[in-house]
């Protein structure tokens, strides 16, 4: 695992994010440090599940950025997953925003809830991405950190079965801009905010380097 394996566009994107760490509010930094502490204590076996209501936008962004950021900062063995309180579909606007950031994402199956293959580096394993409940068989059943990235899921799941750690880290839903001239900007902003905070957590997990 090496940052050199990341696609060039992603390396450029990730290199710009630390300049924004100072803009992360201190209460959120404390939450992200709790995540980093969990990751360090797992000694290379950390599993995180990023959760929002529909597993459609923010949770997928969180999953993919956590995976890419772990490689960028040399956090060994981390496995990132996502889920919802219900299954819908990986929203095309979220797919597009992640592609603009530098991920390579390919649709592999047809249907209302297609399976995608996401890649962030030449020699890094592809991640199978589709909308699912957080307790789907594709996700770990216990010992993981549950990261609640929307207030609705946070309220709906005050207790997450099997989670060793539950953190509330809500982001604004870019869905509000669907079908408007601000759509692309809203998704890019959400993507960048989520990337920045997961990068901060991975930098902390790596020892603050």
Where are these regions (language model features)?
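Short polar/charged helix/loop
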Residues: 2-209
């Amino acid at each position: 695992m090496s940052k050199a394996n990341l696609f060039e566009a992603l390396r450029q994107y990730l290199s710009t994010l630390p300049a924004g760490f100072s803009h992360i509010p201190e209460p959120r930094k404390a939450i992200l440090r709790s995540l980093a502490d969990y990751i360090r204590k797992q000694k290379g076996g950390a599993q995180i599940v990023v959760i929002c209501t529909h597993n459609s936008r923010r949770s997928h962004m969180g999953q993919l950025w956590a995976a890419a950021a772990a490689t960028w900062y040399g956090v060994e063995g981390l496995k990132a997953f996502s889920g919802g309180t219900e299954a819908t579909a990986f929203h095309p606007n979220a797919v597009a925003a992640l592609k603009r950031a530098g991920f390579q994402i390919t649709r592999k199956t047809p249907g209302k809830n297609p399976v995608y293959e996401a890649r962030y580096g030449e020699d890094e394993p592809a991640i199978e991405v589709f909308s699912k409940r957080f307790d789907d068989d594709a996700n770990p059943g216990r010992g993981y950190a549950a990261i609640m990235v929307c207030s609705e899921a946070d309220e709906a799941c005050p207790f997450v079965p099997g989670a060793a750690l539950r953190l509330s880290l809500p982001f604004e839903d870019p869905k509000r801009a669907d079908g408007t001239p601000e759509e692309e900007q809203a998704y890019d902003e959400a993507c960048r905010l989520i990337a920045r905070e997961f990068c901060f957590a991975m930098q902390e997990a790596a020892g603050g380097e």
